[in-house]
Amino acid sequence: VAMPLPQCIETRAFTLDDERIELTAVVFAGITHILVPVSLWGENAAKKAERAARVWAKELPPVFGLLLFDEKEKSLKPLVAVEDVSLIWERGCGSGTSAVGAYLAAREKKDITVSLKQPGGVMHATVSYQNGAVTKIEITGSVAIVAEGTAYL
């Protein structure tokens, strides 16, 4: 599946528990993903990510993701926030997979392919990098419907 290209990939400063943290933001139209190295918060990463999402919500767009990324293990745990509606740990995140792929390609300044283990299975990103920019992102993976119904908000 061809995915949209990021508008920008940049380092942003955040504060949590009086600690200033510099993290990579991958900005797409409609969602911004913040890459959080799993090693930053260790065993408490999930709880800290949930708290960070609530604290940082006022300085981020209405829809954003905090991506707990373990580069060594090539794993991703996506937490996605929709302002005033939800804060959900997703089993798989296509835009998050794209964000990690775009970040790695931009950092390495070359085409990359990465497979990311996520709670619901493995997703793959193939990213083209040319002339100083990400020029193409494609993702693949298995998708299954795990619930059906009507949501009343």
Residue positions per predicted region:
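Active-site proximal loop and beta-alpha junction motif in alpha/beta enzyme cores
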Residues: 1-92, 98-153
